[in-house]
From Swiss-Prot:
The lineage of its organism: Eukaryota, Metazoa, Chordata, Craniata, Vertebrata. GO terms for cellular component: nucleus. It comes from Xenopus laevis (African clawed frog). The keyword Transcription regulation applies. PROSITE patterns: ZINC_FINGER_C2H2_1, ZINC_FINGER_C2H2_2. This is Gastrula zinc finger protein XlCGF8.2DB.
Length: 196
């Protein structure tokens, strides 16, 4: 009949069974009665604990039918499937660019808003994305965790390493439209363009 006689007094959501209401109430109380025996992390719902346990067991019960890659959670599989379908349901209202995932759209929107909520505690420079701040911080710590397997040179970030690897491979993907000279890195092309 679709009747939901058990109503949450906090938010008004209705449930068909009393036990479902009791389970729902943990959202409001903050109670986490289901604990992981491996790491102690608490969960409001039993199903969330069951899903979490696959991290420790290494079990990946949700395989992709296209490429065979396994996932611990169904939601991750659903998200992954967009790679194969090409589905991009999230559209930027400013420029029309489409995204497969909502978090990618939200990150992109910062280009239009100019929002840079992540600031460096060392020099005060602001960044739109946390991963850019993390990468930037390596300048101050002088940390260079990315190593070239060809020559052993170390780099602060993956982008710099990948740019460097083009030198070993002889790749020069950045070409000057004025004279045809090619460069391994875009920064070299930008410097070169100043002579024209």
């Amino acid at each position: 009949t679709g009747e939901k006689p058990f109503t949450c007094k906090e938010c008004g959501k209705g449930f068909t069974q009393k036990r479902n209401l009791a389970s729902h109430m943990t959202i409001h109380t903050g109670e986490k009665p289901f604990s992981c025996t491996e790491c102690g992390k608490g969960f409001t719902q039993k199903r969330n604990l069951a899903s979490h346990l696959t991290i420790h067991t290494g079990e990946k019960p949700f395989p992709c039918t296209e490429c065979g890659k396994g996932f611990t959670q169904k939601s991750n599989l659903v998200s992954h499937m967009k790679i194969h379908t090409g589905e991009k349901p999230f559209t930027c209202t400013e420029c029309g660019k489409e995204f497969a995932h909502k978090h990618r759209l939200l990150g992109h929107l910062k280009i239009h808003t100019g929002e840079k909520p992540f600031s460096c505690t060392e020099c005060g420079k602001h960044f739109a994305h946390k991963y850019h701040l993390v990468s930037h911080m390596k300048i101050h710590t002088r940390e260079k965790p990315f190593t070239c397997t060809e020559c052993g040179e170390h780099f602060a970030n993956k982008v710099s390493l990948l740019g460097h690897l083009k030198m070993h491979k002889g790749e020069k993907p950045f070409t000057c439209t004025e004279c045809g000279n090619s460069f391994t890195q875009v920064s070299s092309l930008v410097s070169h363009m100043k002579i024209h």
